[in-house]
C-alpha cells in the first residue's frame, strides 16, 4: 500500500485524486490506484522517472507520453511501444516500466512489489476504489485502468491482465467484477462502473460491429497477447502504412493495436498537446487539427497512415456509428447516465463481453496477468501516478473536458477513460510509433498488441466487444471514443444523439480524427451550442416579440407623443399626426388640460375630483396607466386615450364633467365645455355663434390642453392603466357622482351650461337653450344617474341600466372587470341608453356641453374604469337618451330636423367633445350622433353643418376637418387635437370603443363596433381590426366598465392573441394606434358630422320618425327598400342613420337587438366599416335592388372588411365557414355583431332612422340601413332601443339585436373564448355574456315592444326572448349563427352566412328581414347578401369583425376553416385595401361606425353618415 499511498500522494499531488474524484469514489480508489501507480512508479522509479521525464519532456513519447496523454495508461500505449521496445527489458526503461505497466504486465513484469498483493489490495482497492481510481486513472489515466482494461491489453495488460488476474483478484476482491466486469471495473473502478463502464466500453468501444470485432480482436489479440506477432507488427506497420487494409487484416490486434496506436498517436498528440497545452487546448487543437489531420491527412502522413487506420477505423466506426446511431444512440441515451448505460453496456458486455471475458480473461490471466497487472499496474500506476499527476491534471482536464462527465463517468465511464486510455495509448503508440518509427513501434506494438492487446483483450471483453470490428483497437477507441463522444454528448445526449444521428458520418469522421475525446469536446459542444442556440432563440424570439410588440409600439408611440407639449394647436395635420402616432399625444395633452382642469375641478369640488378620479387622469387614470405597463397600458392608452377621452368625456360629462363643471374645472370646463359645446354646438348651430363660442372655448381649450399636456395627463394615462383603481374610483365616483354629480354637475353644469347654453343658444338657435340647459343639467344628472343606475332610467332599459350601472360598479378584479366589461358592454349599453334616454335627450346638449368641459376630464373618466362604467352607463344613458330622443328628438326632429339636428349637434358636439362617453352619450342618445352629426347637418345643412361644426372644432379645437371635428369635440379639445385625421378612422373605433362600449356594453358591441371601426380602417385592417376587435372590444369592456382590468385583459388577450396569431400583436401595435382610435370615435363623430352634412336629408326625415318608432320602422322597411334601391347614402339615408342611431341606441342597446343573432353586427361591422363602400355600393345598388345593394354591401364590406377584415370578414366567413360553433362563436359573434350592426342598422337602423327621420329618410337610410344598420348594429348591439326601432323594422332583428347583441357580445366573448389568449377574457366574457344575456333577457321586451308595433318587422319572439338569448348564449356562435341564419332580422348576418348557406340565409332573410322585406333596399341587400357571393365575401368580411380573433382562432380552433376564411377575408381585405376609395370609405365607415354608434345612440345617423362617410371616406 506504499504504492497506493505514494500513488495517493502522486494522485493528490498531481490532482489525480481530485481529477479522479470526478468520480469521487475514484478519489480514494484512485488514490489507491495512484498509490499503486506511484508504487509502480516507485518500483519502476529507476526506470520510470526517466521515461516520465522523457514522456513529459518528450511529450511522453511512449510509456509516459501516453500517460500524460491519457491521464492513465492511455499514455502507456507508448508504454506498450516502449513495451515493444522494452518488453524484453520491460523493467529497465521508463518506457519499459511504462511498457511493463503496459505490456510488461502482460508479460508478467512484476517489477513492482504490488503484483498480486497490491494488485489484490491496491488494485483490489483499485477494483472497488482503485479501479475507480483507475477510472480516475482512466480519467486521469483513462487509458490505463478503464482503458487499461480497454487498452491495457495493448498498453499495459496492467489492469487488463491484472484485471484478468485481477478479474480473479477483482472477482475475488469484487465478485461482481467478471472478466467483462473487470473491464467495467477498470472502467467502473469495479464499483459503480463495473457493468456500466464495461457497458460503456462495450458501447463506446464495442458496438455491435465492435463486438464481432471484439471477437476478432480477441482472436487477434490472443495471438497478439500470446505472441508479439511480427506479423501483427508488420500488420501494425502495414496498418500504419496501409491502415485500411491491414487494420482490417489485423482485425483485433492490428486494428486494435492500430486503433490503439492510432488512438495513442492521436492522443499522444493530444497528450503532447495536452501536456503542452494542458489538455484543453490540446483537445481543441488536436481535435481540430489532429482530427482534421487524421480525418483528412489519413493517406498523407505516418499519422496519415494512422489516419488511414483512423479512417478505416472510422469506416468501421461509421458502421459502428450506424449501429451506434441506432443501437448505440439508444444506448447513448442510456449512456447519459452510465448506470443506465450499464444496462445497455452489459448487453454488449454480455454479448461480446462474455466471449472476451473467457478468452480475454483466460488469455489475460494466462499471460503475466498477476505479474503484469501487479507490476505493470504498479509501474503503470506509478507512471500513471506520476504522469497522471501531470497528465491526469491535464488529461483529466482533457478527459474531464472531453468527458466532462468522465470524472463522473469514471465511475460509470471508465470505458470513456478506457477509451481515453486506449486512445492515448494508441495515440501515444502512434505518436511513439511516429517517434520511434515503425521499428520498435512494431515490436512495441506487437508487444503492446500482445500486452496492451491482452489488456485490451481483457478489455476487449467489453472494448473489443465494442470495437469488435477488424480494427478492434481503433474500433475500440472509436467505439469508446464514439461512445465517449456520445458520453460527452451524454450530458446533451438527447441532443447529441439526435445530432449524432444527423452527424453520424460527421461524427465518424470526427471520431476517427485523432481523438474522439476531442472530437467529442469539439463536436459535442458544437452540437450543444446548436441545440442551445436553436431552442432558446426561438423561445426568446417569441418572448421578445411578444413583449416588444406589446410594448415597442406603445412605448414608441408614447415616446413619439410629446407629453411635454402643454399647448398643442390641434390642427388637422397635428391631429392626424397624433392620431397616427397614437391618440396618446393629443390625448395626453388633452389630459394635461383635463388634469389642469381636473386640478381645478379637483381643487374646487372633490366630488368632481372623485368623479374626475374615475375619469380623473390625475387620480384614477395616472396610477392605472403606470400600473398598466406600457405594453398593455400604452396600447390601451392609445386605444383608450381617445376612447377614454371620449368615454371619459361622456363619463366626465356624467362624472367628471358634471363634477368638474360643478367646480373650477366646471368653469374651466365650462369654457372648455363651452368650447367643446361651442365647437360641437356651434357646428350644429351657425358658424358665427359656433365661431364665437369656439373662440372663447378655444382659448379655454388651449388652457385646458396646456394644463392637460402636463404631468397630470400622464398620470391620467397611468390612471388609464390602473383600471382596477379607476374602476373602483369609477364606482366611487359613480356613487359620489351619482350623488354629488347631479348636484355639482347641475350647478357647475348650470355654469357651464350658462356659457354653454349661451353657446348653445348661439350654436343651436332653433333649440331652446334653456331646455337644452335643463336637459343638459338633466343629462348631467342623468349621467350622474348613469352612475346611479336608476337615477335616469326613464325608459325600460332602466332596469337593465340599473343592473348595468350596477354591473359597472362590480369591482370584481380583472376577471370581474372582464365580466363587467363584457356584461357591462351589453347590459350597460342597454341600461345606459335606456338610462339617459330622456334626460340625455334634453340634457344631452348640456351633457355635451359639459362633455366639452370635461372633455379633458373625459380623458380622466375614460382613463378610469369608473369612467368605463360611466361610459357604459353614459352610453346607456345615451341609449336611454336615444330612446328618449326618440321621444324627445322626434319632437325636436319632427319639429325641425335642422333644429333637432342642431340640438343633437349641440348635445352631441359637447358630449362628443367632452368625452367619447359624451359622444357616446349623445351618440347613445339618438341625439348624440345627430348632435355629432346634426350640428353639422342642421347648421351646415348636413355637410355644411358638419363642416361648420367641424370647422368650429378645427378653428377652436381641431384643424377644421369634418371628420375630426367631432373627434375634436369628443376629445373636448384634448381628445382630437392630435387625432383628427387618423382619429377619424380611429374615431369610429373609439366610437366602437366607448360609444360602442355603452352601446355594446363596452364588450361585444364595442368589439363589434370596434371591429367595424377597425374594419373601417382598411389600412389598419389587422391593426385596427385587431385592436378594435380585441382591444376595442376589450377596451370597451375596459373603457366602459373596467378600464383597469379590461385594458389589461385586452392587452393580455391581445398580446397573447397577437402572439398566437403570428404576431397580430404587430397588429396590436398597429392597432394600438387603432386603439389610439379611441379618439377615432371622435373623428368618427367628426366624420359623423360630415355625415351629418350628408345627414341633411336625414335630418329632414329624423324629426318625425323618431317618435313613431314602429312607424319609422315601417318606414325603415319601406324606406329601407327605397334607400337601398336609391342611393343608400342619400340625405334620407343620413337622416335614417341619424334616426337609426337614435332608435338603435334605445332599442339595440336595450334589447341587444337580434343584430347579434342576425349577424347584423358583423354585417354592421362590415356595413359600419364598409358603410362608405358598402353603403356606397348599396346607395347605387340600393336602387338597383338587392343584388346591387348586396354588391355595394359586399364591396363596402370588402372595403370596410379590410379594416373589419378580422372582425367582419371573419364573422360572415365564420357564419358560413364558422361550422365549429364554439370555435367560431366569438368570431361568429363578431360577425353577428357586425351583421347585427348591418342588419340592425339596415333594419333597426333604418327603423331607427325612420324613427329619427321621416319614413322616407328612414327608408332611404334603411336601404343603406342594411349596411348602415349593420354599421349601427354595433350600436344596436349596445342599443337595444335602437334595435327596438330596427326591430320594428325587422322585429327579429330587434330581438336579435338584443339577444343577438348579447350573443354578439357573447359570441365575441366566445370568440375570445376561442382564442387561447382570450381564455381568461373568454371566461370573464362568457360570464359577462351570461350576465349580459340575463340583462338583455331582462330587457327583451324593449326591442320586441318596439318591433311589435312595426308590422313589417315581425320581431321574432324568441329573438329577444330570454329563451332565445339563453339559446344564443348557450349555443354562442352556433345559436347565434342559427339566429343569424334562422331569423330574418339577421338578414345581413345571414346574408353573410347565407352566402355560404343561401337557403338558410334566405329563410333567415325572410325571417330576419321582415323589416328588410319591408325595407326593399336593405331586404334586397340582405338577399343580395344571401344571393350575392360578393356579399358572401362581405359576409366573410363581415366576419372580419373578429378577424384577429379569427386569426387567433385560426391558431386555436378550426384552423382550416379559419384559414379559408382568413384567406377569403384577406383576399377581400386586400381587395378592400386595394380599393382606395373603399378603403377611405372603409376608414370613414369605421369612423362612421363610431359615428354611427353615436348616431345610433343619437339619431341613427349611420345611413346618412354612411353616405356621407362613403363620400368622405372617398374624399378622405
From Swiss-Prot:
The gene that this protein is the product of is NEXMIF
**Record's compositionally biased regions (Basic and acidic residues):** 380-405, 1456-1479
Keywords for this entry? Chromosomal rearrangement, Cytoplasm, Developmental protein, Disease variant, Intellectual disability, Neurogenesis, Nucleus, Transcription, Transcription regulation
Q: Which species is this UniProt entry from?
A: Homo sapiens (Human)
* Comp. bias (Basic residues): 1443-1453
Q: Which GO terms fall under biological process for this protein? A: negative regulation of cell adhesion mediated by integrin; negative regulation of cell-cell adhesion mediated by cadherin; negative regulation of cell-matrix adhesion; negative regulation of neuron migration; nervous system development
What's the protein here called? Answer: Neurite extension and migration factor
Which disease relates to this protein according to its record?
Intellectual developmental disorder, X-linked 98: A disorder characterized by significantly below average general intellectual functioning associated with impairments in adaptive behavior and manifested during the developmental period. XLID98 patients show delayed psychomotor development, absent or poor speech development, and postnatal growth retardation, often with microcephaly. Some patients show autistic behavioral features, such as stereotypic hand movements and repetitive behaviors.
A GO CC term attached to the entry: nucleus
Domain of life of the organism in this record? Eukaryota
Amino acid at each position: 500500500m506504499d504504492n497506493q499511498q505514494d500513488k495517493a500522494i502522486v494522485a493528490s499531488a498531481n490532482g489525480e485524486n481530485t481529477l479522479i474524484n470526478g468520480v469521487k469514489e475514484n478519489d480514494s480508489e484512485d488514490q489507491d490506484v495512484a498509490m499503486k501507480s506511484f508504487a509502480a512508479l516507485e518500483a519502476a522509479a529507476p526506470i520510470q522517472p526517466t521515461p516520465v521525464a522523457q514522456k513529459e519532456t518528450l511529450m511522453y513519447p511512449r510509456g509516459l507520453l501516453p500517460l500524460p496523454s491519457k491521464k492513465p495508461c492511455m499514455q502507456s500505449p507508448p508504454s506498450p511501444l516502449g513495451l515493444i521496445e522494452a518488453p524484453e527489458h520491460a523493467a529497465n526503461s521508463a518506457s519499459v516500466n511504462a511498457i511493463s505497466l503496459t505490456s510488461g504486465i502482460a508479460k508478467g513484469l512484476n517489477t513492482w512489489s504490488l503484483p498480486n498483493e497490491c494488485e489484490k489490495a491496491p488494485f483490489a482497492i483499485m477494483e472497488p476504489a482503485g479501479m475507480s481510481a483507475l477510472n480516475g486513472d482512466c480519467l486521469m489515466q483513462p487509458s490505463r485502468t478503464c482503458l487499461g482494461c480497454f487498452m491495457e491489453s495493448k498498453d499495459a495488460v496492467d489492469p487488463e491482465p491484472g484485471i484478468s488476474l485481477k478479474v480473479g483478484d477483482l472477482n475475488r476482491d469484487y465478485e461482481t467484477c467478471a472478466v467483462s466486469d473487470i473491464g467495467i471495473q477498470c472502467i467502473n473502478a469495479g464499483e459503480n462502473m463495473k457493468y456500466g463502464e464495461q457497458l460503456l466500453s462495450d458501447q463506446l468501444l464495442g458496438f455491435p460491429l465492435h463486438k464481432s470485432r471484439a471477437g476478432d480482436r480477441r482472436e487477434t489479440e490472443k495471438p497478439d497477447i500470446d505472441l508479439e506477432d511480427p506479423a501483427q507488427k508488420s500488420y501494425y506497420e502495414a496498418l500504419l502504412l496501409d491502415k485500411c487494409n491491414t487494420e482490417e487484416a489485423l482485425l483485433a490486434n492490428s486494428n486494435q493495436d492500430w486503433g490503439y496506436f492510432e488512438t495513442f498517436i492521436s492522443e499522444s498528440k493530444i497528450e503532447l498537446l495536452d501536456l503542452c497545452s494542458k489538455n484543453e487546448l490540446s483537445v481543441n487543437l488536436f481535435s481540430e487539427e489532429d482530427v482534421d489531420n487524421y480525418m483528412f491527412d489519413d493517406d498523407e502522413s505516418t499519422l496519415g497512415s494512422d489516419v488511414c487506420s483512423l479512417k478505416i477505423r472510422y469506416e468501421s466506426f461509421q458502421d459502428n456509428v450506424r449501429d451506434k446511431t441506432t443501437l448505440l444512440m439508444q444506448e447513448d441515451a442510456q449512456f447519459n447516465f452510465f448506470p443506465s448505460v450499464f444496462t445497455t453496456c452489459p448487453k454488449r458486455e454480455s454479448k461480446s463481453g462474455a466471449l472476451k471475458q473467457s478468452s480475454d480473461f483466460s488469455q489475460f490471466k494466462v499471460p503475466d496477468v498477476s505479474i503484469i497487472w501487479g507490476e505493470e499496474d504498479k509501474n503503470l500506476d506509478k507512471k500513471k501516478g506520476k504522469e497522471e499527476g501531470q497528465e491526469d491534471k491535464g488529461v483529466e482536464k482533457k478527459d474531464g473536458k472531453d468527458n466532462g462527465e468522465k470524472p463522473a463517468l469514471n465511475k460509470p465511464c471508465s470505458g470513456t477513460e478506457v477509451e481515453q486510455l486506449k486512445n492515448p495509448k494508441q495515440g501515444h503508440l502512434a505518436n511513439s510509433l511516429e517517434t520511434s518509427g515503425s521499428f520498435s513501434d512494431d515490436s512495441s506494438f506487437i508487444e503492446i498488441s500482445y500486452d496492451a492487446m491482452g489488456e485490451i483483450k481483457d478489455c476487449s471483453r467489453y472494448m473489443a466487444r465494442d470495437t469488435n470490428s477488424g480494427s478492434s483497437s481503433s474500433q475500440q477507441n472509436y467505439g469508446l471514443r464514439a461512445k465517449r463522444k456520445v458520453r460527452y454528448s451524454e450530458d446533451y445526449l438527447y441532443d447529441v444523439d439526435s445530432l449524432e444521428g444527423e452527424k453520424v458520418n460527421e461524427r465518424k469522421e470526427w471520431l476517427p480524427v485523432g481523438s474522439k475525446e476531442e472530437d467529442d469536446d469539439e463536436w459535442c459542444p458544437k452540437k450543444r451550442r446548436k441545440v442551445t442556440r436553436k431552442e432558446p432563440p426561438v423561445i426568446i424570439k417569441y418572448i421578445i416579440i411578444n413583449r416588444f410588440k406589446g410594448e415597442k409600439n406603445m412605448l414608441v408611440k408614447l415616446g413619439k407623443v410629446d407629453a411635454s407639449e402643454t399647448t398643442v394647436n390641434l390642427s388637422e395635420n397635428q391631429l392626424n399626426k397624433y392620431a397616427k402616432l397614437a391618440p396618446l399625444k393629443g390625448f395626453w395633452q388633452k389630459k394635461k388640460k383635463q388634469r389642469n382642469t381636473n386640478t381645478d375641478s379637483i381643487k374646487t369640488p372633490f366630488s368632481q375630483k372623485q368623479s374626475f378620479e374615475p375619469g380623473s387622469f390625475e387620480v384614477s387614470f395616472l396610477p392605472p396607466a403606470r400600473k398598466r405597463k406600457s405594453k398593455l397600458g400604452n396600447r390601451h392608452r392609445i386605444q383608450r386615450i381617445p376612447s377614454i377621452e371620449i368615454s371619459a368625456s361622456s363619463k366626465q360629462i356624467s362624472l367628471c364633467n358634471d363634477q368638474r363643471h360643478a367646480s373650477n374645472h366646471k368653469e374651466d370646463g365650462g369654457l372648455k365645455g363651452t368650447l367643446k359645446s361651442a365647437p360641437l354646438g356651434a357646428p350644429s348651430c351657425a358658424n358665427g355663434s359656433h365661431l364665437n363660442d369656439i373662440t372663447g372655448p378655444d382659448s379655454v381649450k388651449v388652457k385646458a390642453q396646456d394644463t392637460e399636456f402636463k404631468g397630470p395627463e400622464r398620470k391620467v394615462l397611468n390612471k388609464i392603466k390602473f383600471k382596477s383603481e379607476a374602476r373602483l374610483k369609477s364606482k366611487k365616483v359613480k356613487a359620489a357622482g351619482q350623488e354629488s354629480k347631479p348636484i355639482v354637475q347641475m350647478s357647475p353644469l348650470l355654469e357651464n351650461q350658462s356659457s354653454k347654453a349661451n353657446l348653445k343658444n348661439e350654436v343651436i338657435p332653433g333649440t331652446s337653450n334653456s331646455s337644452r340647459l335643463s336637459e343638459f343639467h338633466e343629462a348631467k344628472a342623468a349621467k350622474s344617474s348613469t352612475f346611479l343606475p336608476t337615477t335616469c332610467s326613464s325608459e325600460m332599459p332602466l332596469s337593465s341600466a340599473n343592473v348595468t350601472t350596477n354591473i359597472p360598479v362590480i369591482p370584481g378584479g380583472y376577471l370581474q372587470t372582464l365580466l363587467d366589461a363584457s356584461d357591462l358592454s351589453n347590459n350597460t349599453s342597454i341600461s345606459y341608453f335606456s338610462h339617459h334616454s330622456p334626460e340625455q335627450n334634453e340634457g344631452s346638449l348640456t351633457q355635451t356641453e359639459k362633455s366639452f368641459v370635461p372633455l379633458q376630464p373625459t380623458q380622466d373618466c375614460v382613463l378610469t374604469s369608473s369612467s368605463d362604467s360611466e361610459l357604459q352607463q353614459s352610453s346607456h344613458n345615451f341609449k336611454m337618451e336615444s330612446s328618449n330622443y326618440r321621444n324627445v328628438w322626434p319632437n325636436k326632429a319632427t319639429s325641425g330636423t335642422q333644429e333637432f339636428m342642431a340640438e343633437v349637434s349641440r348635445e352631441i358636439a359637447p358630449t362628443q367633445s367632452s368625452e367619447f362617453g359624451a359622444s357616446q352619450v349623445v351618440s347613445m342618445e339618438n341625439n348624440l350622433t345627430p348632435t355629432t352629426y346634426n350640428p353639422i347637418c342642421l347648421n351646415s345643412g348636413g355637410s355644411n353643418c358638419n363642416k361648420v361644426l367641424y370647422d368650429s372644432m378645427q378653428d377652436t379645437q381641431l384643424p377644421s376637418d369634418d371628420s375630426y371635428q367631432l373627434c375634436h369635440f369628443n376629445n373636448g379639445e384634448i381628445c382630437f387635437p392630435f387625432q383628427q385625421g387618423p382619429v377619424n378612422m380611429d374615431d369610429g373605433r373609439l366610437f366602437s370603443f366607448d360609444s360602442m362600449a355603452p352601446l355594446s356594453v363596452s364588450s361585444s358591441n364595442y368589439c363589434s363596433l370596434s371591429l367595424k371601426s377597425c374594419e373601417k380602417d382598411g389600412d389598419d385592417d389587422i391593426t385596427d381590426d385587431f385592436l378594435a376587435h380585441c382591444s376595442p372590444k376589450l377596451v370597451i369592456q375596459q373603457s366602459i366598465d373596467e378600464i383597469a382590468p379590461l385594458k389589461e385583459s385586452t392587452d393580455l388577450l391581445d398580446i397573447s392573441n397577437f402572439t398566437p396569431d403570428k404576431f397580430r400583436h404587430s397588429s396590436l401595435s398597429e392597432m394600438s394606434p387603432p386603439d389610439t382610435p379611441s379618439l377615432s370615435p371622435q373623428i368618427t363623430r367628426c366624420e359623423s358630422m360630415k355625415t351629418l352634412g350628408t345627414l341633411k336629408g336625414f335630418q329632414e326625415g329624423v324629426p318625425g320618425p323618431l317618435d313613431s318608432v314602429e312607424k319609422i320602422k315601417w318606414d325603415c322597411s319601406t324606406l329601407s327598400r327605397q334607400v337601398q334601391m336609391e342611393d343608400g347614402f342619400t340625405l334620407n339615408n343620413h337622416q335614417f342613420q341619424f334616426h337609426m342611431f337614435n332608435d338603435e341606441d334605445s332599442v339595440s342597446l336595450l334589447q341587444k337587438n337580434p343584430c347579434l343573432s342576425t349577424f347584423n353586427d358583423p354585417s354592421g361591422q362590415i356595413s359600419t366599416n364598409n358603410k362608405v363602400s358598402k353603403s356606397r355600393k348599396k346607395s347605387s345598388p340600393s336602387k338597383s335592388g338587392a343584388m346591387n345593394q348586396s354588391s355595394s354591401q359586399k364591396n363596402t364590406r370588402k372595403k370596410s372588411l379590410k379594416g373589419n377584415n378580422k372582425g367582419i370578414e371573419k364573422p360572415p366567413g365564420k357564419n358560413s365557414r364558422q361550422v365549429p360553433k364554439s370555435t367560431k362563436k366569438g368570431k361568429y359573434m363578431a360577425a353577428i355583431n357586425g351583421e347585427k350592426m348591418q342588419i340592425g342598422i339596415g333594419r333597426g337602423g333604418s327603423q331607427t332612422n325612420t324613427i329619427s327621420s321621416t319614413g322616407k329618410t328612414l327608408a332611404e337610410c334603411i336601404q343603406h340601413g342594411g349596411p348602415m344598420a349593420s354599421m349601427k348594429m354595433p350600436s344596436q348591439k349596445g342599443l337595444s332601443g335602437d334595435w327596438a326601432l330596427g326591430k320594428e323594422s325587422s322585429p327579429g332583428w330587434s330581438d336579435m339585436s338584443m339577444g343577438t347583441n348579447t350573443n354578439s357580445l357573447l359570441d365575441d366573448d366566445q370568440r375570445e373564448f376561442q382564442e387561447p389568449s382570450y381564455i381568461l377574457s373568454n371566461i370573464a366574457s362568457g360570464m359577462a355574456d351570461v350576465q349580459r344575456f340575463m340583462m338583455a333577457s331582462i330587457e327583451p321586451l324593449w326591442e320586441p315592444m318596439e318591433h311589435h308595433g312595426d308590422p313589417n318587422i315581425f320581431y321574432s319572439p324568441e329573438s329577444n326572448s330570454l329563451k332565445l338569448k339563453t339559446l344564443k348564449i348557450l349555443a354562442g356562435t352556433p345559436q347565434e349563427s342559427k339566429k343569424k341564419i334562422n331569423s330574418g332580422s339577421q338578414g345581413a348576418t345571414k346574408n353573410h352566412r347565407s352566402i355560404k348557406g343561401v337557403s338558410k340565409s334566405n329563410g333567415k332573410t325572410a325571417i330576419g328581414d321582415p323589416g328588410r322585406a319591408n325595407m326593399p333596399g336593405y331586404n334586397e341587400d340582405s338577399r343580395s347578401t344571401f344571393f350575392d357571393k360578393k356579399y358572401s365575401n362581405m359576409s366573410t368580411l363581415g366576419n372580419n369583425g373578429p378577424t384577429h380573433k379569427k386569426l387567433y382562432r385560426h391558431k386555436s380552433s378550426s384552423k382550416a376553416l379559419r384559414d379559408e376564411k382568413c384567406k377569403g377575408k384577406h383576399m377581400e381585405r386586400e381587395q378592400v385595401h386595394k380599393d382606395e376609395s373603399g378603403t377611405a370609405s372603409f376608414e370613414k365607415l369605421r369612423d362612421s361606425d363610431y359615428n354611427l354608434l353615436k348616431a345610433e345612440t343619437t339619431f341613427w345617423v349611420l345611413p346618412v353618415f354612411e353616405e356621407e362617410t362613403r363620400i368622405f371616406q372617398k374624399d378622405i
